């Protein structure tokens, strides 16, 4: 059985510059709860606890968004993303448990899953579903990623998620990752696509073909940079490719709501998203790259490539200016 997981109200908050309102969350969850979705992820784009001047202040608090979603979800599981360092057990995880969050996804750089251990163990001890998310998956080979997945399983994660944060993968990459990890762990394996190189839906379908049990998507692809894999496109192609009778209408209704309410934030492929995907860099850096490259008089492509060489990850926005200065001094 495949569990479809909706990140519109979390990853989509990146695109909306962390301004998604409680009313929008309520309206969206009302439809999502009838769709057959397994989980609906809600919160700041960088996860609960991340609202800050560094990565963006949210216009509505995590608490309000989660309480709103909780009141409008009965069938689908209320889920959150969190990154150790932004989120702490006392400040963020315990309040989320008290609100009634069902699923916690703990995200780390693919080479640093050990930083998730304390959070995963705490969440698991409180009988909540916990997934380990390996961000920036393209920065290691398949065998190394499988080794990290084994560690997440050992910590207590009930699923491990391959996150293509930079939208760098093509389907053959996804095939290799999913196969390697499924051969290495006994827990469920999931995949989270980004669409920098217009491969999001194709990559999600490849993950399905290789037996991934959890597939992420967002309505209209609403997400950081050039967005995520379009949830409605995944569903319609899944129906066609796997002869499944998944109901399509609610997904189209969610898509229409996003199209109506988030017109100014809908993702599109730009030269910047292509450059970030090619360089293997988190596309949420696009506003800073654009501003700083103009300020320093250097090309965006040159700056993207240097960020890729230095393997910057989300949360390291403050380093972009330093790197631009280094390029000026070459």
Where do the model's predicted regions map?
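Catalytic cores and adjacent flexible loops of soluble metabolic enzymes
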Residues: 1-330
